[in-house]
């Protein structure tokens, strides 16, 4: 492998913005936000909309999210429905 051409691979914390569920994983993603994990170390925090904690395929049931979809935002903006 050539040195200096690969992105930095490190541990980051991903947080489901709907449920608040957090998990740690290796990634090349970076963030200015940080969070202290259970082991006492500080890691970059990446917020994501859907994880296995909130996706109906993994949960086996439908969870209602707080975030509106594109259609809902359009309808609110133009006073439809």
UniProtKB/Swiss-Prot annotation:
Organism: Lactiplantibacillus plantarum (strain ATCC BAA-793 / NCIMB 8826 / WCFS1)
Subunit record text: Part of the 50S ribosomal subunit.
Induction notes from the record: In strain DPC2739 is induced in mid-exponential phase cells by exposure to 42 degrees Celsius for one hour.
Name this polypeptide is given: Large ribosomal subunit protein bL31B
Gene responsible for this protein: rpmE2
Family the UniProt entry places it in: Belongs to the bacterial ribosomal protein bL31 family. Type B subfamily.
Domain of life per record: Bacteria
Pfam family, one: Ribosomal_L31
Swiss-Prot/TrEMBL keywords: Ribonucleoprotein, Ribosomal protein, Stress response
Keyword Cytoplasm in annotation: no
An annotated GO BP: translation
GO molecular function: structural constituent of ribosome
GO CC, one annotated term: ribonucleoprotein complex
């Amino acid at each position: 492998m050539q040195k200096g051409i690969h992105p930095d691979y490190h541990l980051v914390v991903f947080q489901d913005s709907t449920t608040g569920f957090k998990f740690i994983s290796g990634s090349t993603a970076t963030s200015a936000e940080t969070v202290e994990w259970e082991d006492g170390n500080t890691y970059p925090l990446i917020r994501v909309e859907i994880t296995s904690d909130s996706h109906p395929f993994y949960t086996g049931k439908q969870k209602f999210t707080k975030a509106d979809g594109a259609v809902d935002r359009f309808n609110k903006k133009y006073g439809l429905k």
